[in-house]
């Protein structure tokens, strides 16, 4: 079971800012994933991602589909300066998160609740209020 504390520890090891109560889990839309060049290329085969929103940018960490643990080699940080827009589009049972940059657009399906991540639902509500 993934805990938000694990995301904090992961980002601290990489010297990336972490914002409490601002982590969610998203599922990638491979057909729209045009940003992936270089360091995140290995993450294309993965489906679930932990996403943390902070004042300095957005951290995206691949999750192992079997264990649910954070993957070291599947990491991308998009700095605040690179982000053109961030928006959540409400769908019937979920949201679609779109992060637009000059390099392309990242799109994730974000469910309202996530099994094994009890913190996800409350954090999603907090993030939706702040955007």
Q: Positions of the model-derived regions?
A:
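Anionic N-terminal interaction surfaces
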Residues: 1-55
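Short amphipathic alpha-helical segments and helix-helix/interface helices
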Residues: 8, 124-125
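Surface-exposed beta-strand edges and flanking loops
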Residues: 20, 27, 53, 80, ...
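Generic structural motif
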Residues: 31-32, 56, 81, 91, ...
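Phosphoinositide-binding peripheral membrane targeting modules
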Residues: 39-50, 55-98
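Canonical phosphoinositide-binding patch of PH/PH-like domains
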Residues: 103-122
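A membrane-cytosol interface segment of integral membrane proteins
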Residues: 125-131
């Amino acid at each position: 079971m993934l805990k938000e504390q694990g995301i904090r520890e992961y980002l601290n090891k990489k010297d990336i800012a972490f914002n409490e109560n601002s982590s969610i889990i998203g599922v990638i839309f491979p057909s729209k994933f045009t940003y992936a060049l270089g360091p995140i290329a290995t993450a294309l085969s993965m489906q679930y991602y932990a996403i943390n929103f902070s004042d300095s940018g957005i951290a995206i960490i691949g999750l192992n589909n079997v264990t649910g643990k954070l993957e070291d080699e599947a990491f991308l940080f998009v700095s605040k300066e690179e982000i053109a827009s961030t928006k959540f589009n409400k769908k019937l049972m979920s949201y679609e998160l779109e992060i637009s940059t000059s390099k392309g657009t990242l799109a994730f399906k974000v469910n309202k609740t996530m099994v094994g991540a009890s913190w996800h639902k409350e954090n999603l509500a907090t993030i939706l209020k702040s955007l």
